[in-house]
Amino acid sequence: MVKLRLKRCGRKQRAVYRIVVIDVRSRREGRDLRKVGFYDPINNQTYLNVPAILYFLEKGAQPTATVHDILKKAGVFTELTLNQTKFT
């Protein structure tokens, strides 16, 4: 199974996180499949590659709780539901 997870980067006492797509069996700092975003909790900055995130969510990737909150705040799930509705 594949998850959207935070990967810690940065210095001591100055954590920054990358939002990555990674196999669930890999460790936190393990090799990721793709980098899809960036989150800085100190400066409250977020960068998301929304098309890549939507692609992996449609394929069945599960976000962790923290990543889910970040994506919800950015409005990614509203775009996901718009993509999934079919016009007849």
UniProtKB/Swiss-Prot annotation:
Statement: the UniProt record of this protein carries the keyword Kinase: no
Species: Gossypium barbadense
Lineage: Eukaryota, Viridiplantae, Streptophyta, Embryophyta, Tracheophyta
Principal subcellular localisation of the protein: plastid
GO molecular function annotations of the record: structural constituent of ribosome
Disulfide bonds: none
Protein location: Plastid, Chloroplast
Name listed for the protein in its UniProt record: Small ribosomal subunit protein bS16c
Keyword annotations: Chloroplast, Plastid, Ribonucleoprotein, Ribosomal protein
Plastid recorded as keyword: yes
UniProt superkingdom: Eukaryota
SUPFAM superfamilies membership: Ribosomal protein S16
Spans traversing the lipid bilayer: none
GO BP annotations, alphabetical order: mitochondrial translation
Family of the protein in this entry: Belongs to the bacterial ribosomal protein bS16 family.
